């Protein structure tokens, strides 16, 4: 029988602080060669009034986080949705972005209130075996995301060079450019954030240009955006809608955002400062994801206009009669609906609107791949340091991640063809969706715990909304698996799927169980997991020191 009485509450030096489990005093960590080596001061202003100077000081983490909404996997998902369903799935893109904002809001609040990122909190609360398994799944998500960035960058080099740079060469080039970008943050945190802002601007301008030249029907676009219907849709459209959600909400991005917000100097001994930081980070994230939504909308609308219901024969004839006739051979001469990817997408834009459209598309794709590369590096370092307390330099970290990403990508690029490389991109979108519960469940667990978040714990409405998000994610994953099973090439693969499913469902069930405990389901609590109700045994739970 578990007592409903919580342990005595003691005073503590800062708001939402989390101490580790009893044990030897930790040794001082070496200087961290990460994004967090520099803190941005927050200017003073009258309490209770909105300040543009303060908003500017808080601006940065949200835009870095938003880059995961614009990676090559998202671009491919957008263009395929446009080609398959026209403008009918724009409302799915809108609401998937809103769901993503809700998840990122929780991540930012955890980092601000506790002063720890999600990986660090997982290290404190989960036992060793679930913690290691959880870390491995997030590392898998990061490697999968990095593979998408490698694919997108390699294809952009191939398009920009008119095919002179083979795909496998483009993959190898990504090794060099990644290490080049690692030196950028030596020039200061704000300059690094400004560079990411430049890459987002390049994407907005390039994909915005495609939108202008394609000139999609504004009435049909607005209808697809506001009406949550899909008349005449079947399984292909439904699978594409599921793919949009999986591509938009990425698991490693939740861990990343919870760490990025720690780069601002927030006095966590003052309740009012914590509340203010939460507000400004939410405003910044809303602006950043609004920009990412507009860019994704540009891509989906362009291909909804240019590709929807188009056959391979029609695409072949368009290219054969254009200045890019050498590209016509990539489209088979049949009456099947064209199956588009990020390579074919650039080609058909060039055939329809001139070579400039192709090269501008490739530049936008290159910007998407490069920006995502750096944020993936930071996510990997934060996750490794949080879960394992293992300090690696950025150089070593990116070498590990990029090596894991490049090997399978090079093999596909060398021994298979472009279609298989783009198909790998689609498979990686499915992987990201399957791994999403391993980020959403922990963030929902810890942000719902008063022992961790104090008065900033999720309220009933927030818990209801985020629980619905989790149910939606699980339903999406189940649908993905059921839809994918018939496509397995050999019955022997079913055994591998079953083995994977046992581990996957076991870890998901454990995380769901602890999440229910954190939501107050005391009847589910085991004596070994009382800390999900009351906090860690030696955790100090007092109020705020200072004014509030």
Swiss-Prot record:
Changing residue 169 to G: Found in strains resistant to unrelated intracellular parasites, such as Mycobacterium bovis, Salmonella typhimurium and Leishmania donovani; highly glycosylated; locates properly to macrophage late endosome/lysosome membranes; has divalent transition metal transporter activity. Macrophage-specific antiporter that fluxes metal ions in either direction against a proton gradient. Localized to late endosomal lysosomal membranes, delivers bivalent cations from the cytosol into these acidic compartments where they may directly affect antimicrobial activity. Involved in iron metabolism and host natural resistance to infection with intracellular parasites. Residues 1-29 are annotated as: Disordered. It is a multi-pass membrane protein. Residues 74-82, 161-164, 215-237, 305-346, 416-426, 486-493 are extracellular. One of its GO terms (cellular component) is plasma membrane. It is found in: Late endosome membrane; Lysosome membrane. Induction: In response to lymphokine, such as IFNG, or bacterial products, such as LPS. Induced in macrophages at early stages of infection. InterPro entries: NRAMP_fam. GO terms for molecular function: iron ion transmembrane transporter activity; manganese ion transmembrane transporter activity; metal cation:proton antiporter activity; protein homodimerization activity. Macrophages; spleen and liver. It comes from the Eukaryota. Glycans are attached at residues 321, 335. It holds the Pfam family Nramp. Belongs to the NRAMP family. This is Natural resistance-associated macrophage protein 1. Disulfide bonds: none annotated. The lineage of its organism: Eukaryota, Metazoa, Chordata, Craniata, Vertebrata. Residues 1-55, 103-139, 185-193, 257-284, 367-397, 448-463, 514-548 are cytoplasmic. Glycosylated. One of its GO terms (biological process) is defense response to Gram-negative bacterium. Keywords: Endosome, Glycoprotein, Ion transport, Iron, Iron transport, Lysosome, Membrane, Transmembrane, Transmembrane helix, Transport. Coiled coil: none annotated.
